[in-house]
């Protein structure tokens, strides 16, 4: 998804007003990034570890973003299971390796639509500065490649 409006629309389909306060706070953080960032990228991945971490790494590597980043991460898991602390640390490490100076706000929640062994990640990256994309050599201001 390229534009902020497309990202907002997608987030509207993922969050409902009936969700608990923890999730609502995370949605407000997504909105904060969308309102203040010069450019944004939304990444969604779903699956079991360690494949999920590899997918996240591949998605992040393809972005070629600048250095000043804010990241909002929502990790979801099936209500009948629980999230492993080691798995959560692995996912946050992938993000940190991608951008060591990144500001990360994260939260966890349940999603009954997931398989019991799967996680889903909803990650929004916002950059406060415009830059030249290393891949396409174009000036990027509204969206990331």
Residue ranges and their predicted role:
Residues 1-145:
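Tubulin/FtsZ superfamily GTPase core signature
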């Amino acid at each position: 998804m390229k534009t902020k409006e497309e990202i907002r629309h997608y987030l509207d389909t993922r969050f409902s007003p009936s969700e608990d306060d923890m999730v609502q706070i995370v949605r407000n953080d997504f909105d904060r990034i969308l309102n203040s960032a010069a450019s944004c990228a939304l990444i969604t991945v779903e699956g079991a570890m360690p494949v999920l971490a590899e997918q996240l790494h591949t998605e992040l590597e393809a972005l070629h973003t600048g250095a000043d980043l804010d990241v909002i991460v929502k990790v979801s898991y099936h209500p009948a299971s629980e999230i492993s602390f080691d798995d959560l640390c692995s996912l946050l490490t992938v993000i940190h390796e991608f951008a060591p100076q990144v500001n990360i706000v994260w939260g966890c929640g349940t999603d009954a639509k997931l398989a019991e062994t799967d996680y889903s990640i909803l990650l929004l990256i916002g950059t406060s500065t415009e830059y030249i994309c290393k891949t396409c050599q174009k000036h990027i201001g509204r969206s990331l490649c």
